[in-house]
C-alpha cells in the first residue's frame, strides 16, 4: 500500500538523501569488492575506544536507561561548559548549552522553531547535502554563499553583506 497521499507536499518534494544513496552504493560495492572506501556518512574507520564502551555499559548498569531532559543531562552540559572554559577560554551559561543526538537534529529543530514561510537562511557552500531539505521543510529559502578553494573556503564580509536581506532569518554556520 502506498501511503504517500498521507504526506504533506513539503515532504513529498524532498529528494532522497544523497549521503544515504552513496552509503547504500558503497555497502553494495563492499559485497563485491574488498577495497571499497565509503566517504559518505563520515563514519570513523575505527571501533569505539574501549574506555567509552565501558562507560556506556556502566551507565546502563547504573540505570541511565530513561528519557533524558530535552536539553541533555545537566552533568554532561556542565562538562561541556568546563571544557569550553578550560580549552577555549569561552564562557557559556547552562541555558546556552544543549546536548543533542547530532547536528542534523539540532539544525532541523532550530529551523522548525524560528523559520517562517519565505524566510531566508544563509548557508556557506560547499555545505552538507541535507541543509536544503531542512530549510525547505521549515518553509524557508536557502541562500547559498559560495566559498571554494580559490577563497580557501572562507566567505568574505562583502559576500555576507550582499546575501543579507530583509527576509534573512538565520545564518547557518556549521562545520
Residue ranges and their predicted role:
Residues 92-97, 117-120, 166-167:
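Short acidic capping loops at alpha-helix termini that bridge into adjacent secondary structure
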Residues 143, 149-175:
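Active-site phosphate-binding strand-loop segment of PLP-dependent enzymes
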Residues 2-102, 109:
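N-terminal small-domain helix-loop-helix segment of the aminotransferase-like
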Residues 35, 120, 141:
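Residue-level detector of anion-binding/catalytic polar loops
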Residues 113-135:
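Conserved PLP-anchoring active-site segment centered on the Schiff-base-forming lysine
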